[in-house]
Amino acid sequence: MAALTWRRFMNINKDLKAAVNMNPTRNTRNLTVENLCNMIDGGTLTIPLYQRDVSWTKQKCVELLNYELLGKSPISAISVNVINNTDSDFAVPQVSFIDREVMPNMVRGQFSVVDGQQRLTTNYKAFCNNDDLRDIVLDLGSGKFVITTENIRGNQVPVGILMNRDSGKLISYVQSKRGMDNDVMAFLLLARTKILSYAYTVNMAEDLSEDEQITWFEVLNNAGSRVSIIQMRFAKMKAHGLDIYTQYTNI
């Protein structure tokens, strides 16, 4: 009788029922650094407006680049929200990488970064030879990326040349250096291929609301080092034409 009563009167929350039938960990892809940088170039990989600005130091960028080139285990996954519902009343406004310009249009299937902005920005800055990384070089003597404080030496290659979207930039650079022969050229092309083909696991969710994205963001990105609510609010002001970072933080 007790078992019959349980089956007849025990109610299970409908949201719980739906949750146990969904496994979000199955929705993943592997994308290379080059794939991801090309998506940023094409505007199909963007940043939600609530994300704070880039916070990594140059040394952190060097550590990432060295791990991608020399590391023996994969780096943690990048997490994105796939925007299928592009209705302006639902979709969170997006900004571009580096300059954080508000994107006027969204396309169905666009990737919005929830976790991984710092890593993606570092790789993209190298891909487009951004001035921020001009003094980061691959030092062939020490066998790693370093920050140079003097003129670039003959056995060093700027990361923005090595990882440049145009492979011809690397070839021209090597040909201009008297001490670099064909063997060095072959090695550098191999190193370039290694780092641009480095694959990240990309975890994907679809059409998360802003609140759901922020919850995911906080779980992934703020554990142990919370980003303040005011930082998120400052970031969101960009949608209304007020860029708090460029207008006030450099005074």
Specify the residue positions occupied by each region the protein language model found.
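Basic- and aromatic-enriched surface patches that contact anionic nucleotides/nucleic acids
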Residues: 13-35, 41-55, 65-251
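Intrinsically disordered, low-structural-confidence terminal and linker regions
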Residues: 1-17
